[in-house]
């Protein structure tokens, strides 16, 4: 481990859009908002406090309340990026995607499947590998319709279908 407390090959970078640290694997190019497993948290906190304090400047977004949420995304051919880890070229229509998202919403709200399990299998977002977990975020960090829906939920609640330029989402707020 380096003085960052991160296991090799992880490093700390600063997100220009969110003005906060994130964790980057130099071998796999994976990025995480939360520290990877086997991180020495005390060393990481010390590193961030001592080395990165000047790099991260407070912004209105970083001082706003934060929430944690998971989601499941159903993309369609008109989505902002009509591809996913499951399909290189998504061909379903917008209406087909909406109906599929509504079906997933019913499954989640009936309790027959968890967000984690359904997102891992069905979500078109790269967060699927984490069960749809998005980590912590504040205002002005997500697309407005998504953010408004997520912040309106109480912890544990599941949203209806939310449309953004990415596709159709079902969101579950955790905290």
Curated annotation (Swiss-Prot):
Provide the WW domain boundaries: 4-38
Coiled-coil residues are none
> What Enzyme Commission number(s) does the record list for this chain?
5.2.1.8
Q: Chief subcellular site? A: nucleus
Q: Which GO terms describe its molecular function?
A: chromatin-protein adaptor activity; peptidyl-prolyl cis-trans isomerase activity
Q: Give a Gene Ontology cellular component term annotated to this protein.
A: cytosol
What are the residue boundaries of the PpiC domain, all occurrences included?
A: 64-175
Q: Identify the keywords attached in UniProt to this record, alphabetized.
A: Cell cycle, Cell division, Isomerase, Mitosis, Nucleus, Rotamase
Q: Where in the cell is it found?
A: Nucleus
Any single biological process term in GO: positive regulation of transcription initiation by RNA polymerase II
User: What reaction(s) does this enzyme catalyze?
Assistant: [protein]-peptidylproline (omega=180) = [protein]-peptidylproline (omega=0)
Q: List the disulfide bonds.
A: none
Name the domain of life this protein comes from: Eukaryota
Q: What sort of enzyme, by top EC class, is this? A: isomerase
PANTHER family for the chain: PEPTIDYL-PROLYL CIS-TRANS ISOMERASE, PEPTIDYL-PROLYL CIS-TRANS ISOMERASE-RELATED
Q: What does this protein do?
A: Has a role in the G1/S stage transition of mitosis where it is involved in the dephosphorylation of cdc25 and wee1.
Name the chain's protein.
Answer: Peptidyl-prolyl cis-trans isomerase pin1
Q: Which organism is it from?
A: Schizosaccharomyces pombe (strain 972 / ATCC 24843)
Give the classification, highest ranks: Eukaryota, Fungi, Dikarya, Ascomycota, Taphrinomycotina
Gene name of this polypeptide? pin1
